[in-house]
Amino acid sequence: MSIFKNLYNYRELLKTNVKKDIRGRYKGSFLGILWSFLNPLLQVVVYWIVFPYLFGRGVTGENYLIYLITGIIPWTFFMTSVNMGTSSIKANGGIIKKVYFPREIIPLSQVLSGIVNFLISCLIIIIFCIGTGTGLSYHVIAVFPILIVQSLLTLGIVFILSAIDVYVQDI
């Protein structure tokens, strides 16, 4: 329980770290935060073209695009959070050696910035559902419990891999 108390006591540092991660991800980029929309959108377009047309396989039909978007956006959240979070302890080694704070803040901030990115990307799902006439159903309320479970799973994996990454270089 002391970990939760420490995180609560250092919540401002956590919030600042999340903001820094989000700004740093798009700093120097011409499109900035628009990449939160474009990255999953471009992935969807590639999968939409590659699988049914080039390979002649995959799920087809009128909801194929929605099918792709609802799978790629959560996967992108998971993949990005694990990739960034795994190397986060080693990347912030200098500050860890100089200042005391709960070390869990560093990987946690990576996952939280991934959640913010995910929620921004969810606007794409909403736009496509409304734009294609599929509409939104009552299943939308399941997004938040699923997001909590996926975030906790991602956080657990990130904690384990970031600890291993300090000692093993190739993770």
Functional labels for PLM-detected ranges:
Residues 1-171:
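Hydrophobic transmembrane alpha-helices and immediately adjacent juxtamembrane helices
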